[in-house]
């Protein structure tokens, strides 16, 4: 990663003995020593507005749009230019990303390979993807030591007065979509929309749906407020809610 100007790494639920050995090895890159270690993918991508999954499509029928690697950089550039943050997600070498992992991805990037030998090891896949991005995004988009799409504190202060209009344009972060998904799931259960046995399937399908809708932060707040209100009414019933305004907002 560091070879291509990328400086922010998050590692999700690593196998501790191997991870500890890698970080403590003589000559271990600063990148590894500064990496975030998180228990779940949802936390790792919470601040990101575009999450890109990686893997070999093969005979699978992908549930997200598939973008060839050479066409990825313009999408990343557009997201950065409008103030978003981008994450690329790589799965474990043995099994790749699971279906559950992919539910947090907006799109899937495919590396062009020989159909007779489509698989690449993890290190190769990371290097090829980051090289392709670095070769097309050289300059301000890949500032050394700076997280992609990060807004500094001084810039944020200067934009305070325009935060509402900015949220109306900025894509909803993965964390915002997760909050919407959680309250919608609760409302579905409270309304007996589907049995609890279907919860795992609903969990997956709902996250894919929210990403296909390409919501803004403003959209996500409104939907969150709406479903919180619906859930409040469902949980309390007509008799308890009369004369009370109930919760509002996001």
Q: Predicted regions: what is each one?
A:
Residues 2-250:
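Post-transcriptional modification and biogenesis factors for structured RNAs
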């Amino acid at each position: 990663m560091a070879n291509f100007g990328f400086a922010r790494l998050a590692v999700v639920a690593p196998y501790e003995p191997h991870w500890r050995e890698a970080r403590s090895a003589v000559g271990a890159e600063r990148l590894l020593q500064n990496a975030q270690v998180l228990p779940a993918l949802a936390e790792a991508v919470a601040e990101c507005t575009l999450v890109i999954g990686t893997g070999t499509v093969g005979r699978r029928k992908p549930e997200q749009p598939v973008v060839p690697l050479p066409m990825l950089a313009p999408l990343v550039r557009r997201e950065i230019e409008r103030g978003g943050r981008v994450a690329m997600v790589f799965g474990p070498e043995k099994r790749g990303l699971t279906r559950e992992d992919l539910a947090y991805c907006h799109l899937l990037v495919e590396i062009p390979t020989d159909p007779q030998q489509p698989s690449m090891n993890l290190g190769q896949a990371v290097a090829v993807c980051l090289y392709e991005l670095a070769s097309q995004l050289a300059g301000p988009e890949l500032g050394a030591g700076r997280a992609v799409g990060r807004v500094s504190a001084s810039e944020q202060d200067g934009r305070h007065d325009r935060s509402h209009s900015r949220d109306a344009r900025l894509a909803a972060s993965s964390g915002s979509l997760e909050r919407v998904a959680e309250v919608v799931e609760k409302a579905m259960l409270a309304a007996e929309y589907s049995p609890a046995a279907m919860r795992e399937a609903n969990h997956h399908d709902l996250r894919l749906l929210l990403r296909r809708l390409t919501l803004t932060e403003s959209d996500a707040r409104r939907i969150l407020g709406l479903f919180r209100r619906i859930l409040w009414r469902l949980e309390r019933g007509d008799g308890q809610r009369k004369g009370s305004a109930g919760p509002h907002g996001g």
